[in-house]
Amino acid sequence: MGDALAVSLMQMRGFTSVDFARLHPGGSLGRRLLMTVGNVMRSHDLPVVAPDCSATDMIHAISKGGLGLIIICDGDRIEGIVTDGDVRRAMERRRAEFFNIKAADIATPNPKTISADRKLIEAEKMMTRNKVTSLLVTDAAAPVKLPT
């Protein structure tokens, strides 16, 4: 009964989820609606490798990075990403040839990216819509970062 009264009062006063988030910024709704990707991105110790990275080095970099992926960069240019799933699928398909492949051979080109100033809820929606678990955060000052 109390919930029904609260909802009715909120509707009568035009009280929105954004209003609630502003009054309760520490809650999960407030965090998602008010925080930006820049507030939660990982910008250090990213698992970045060159396009010619070997299969063995890819596995090591994915394990060490702790994110389930590596970022393939040629200088400051993002060439793609390789996930632990990409590595598993390549092992199944290529079997004996697997250890001859390079990162560029199995990389997903044009990974999903987002700007650091976007709201966290936008990043969550984008990840859900694209069925991915990570987004690269790009901007002119720092071309590669990851929301954590």
Language-model segments: residues:
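A short, polar/charged loop-to-alpha-helix boundary motif
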Residues: V87-N100
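The conserved cystathionine-beta-synthase
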Residues: V49-G66, M91, T113-T133, V137-A140
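Alpha-helical scaffold segments in soluble metabolic enzymes
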Residues: A4-S8, R22, N39, D57, ...
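A glycine-centered beta-loop-beta connector
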Residues: V40, I62-G65, I70-D86, M127, ...
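Bateman (tandem CBS) regulatory domains
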Residues: L33-L46, N100-P111
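Internal, active-site/partner-interface "lid" segment
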Residues: Q11-R42
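Short alpha-helices
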Residues: M1-F15
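Cytosolic regulatory modules rich in charged/polar residues
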Residues: G14, A116-K119, P143-T148
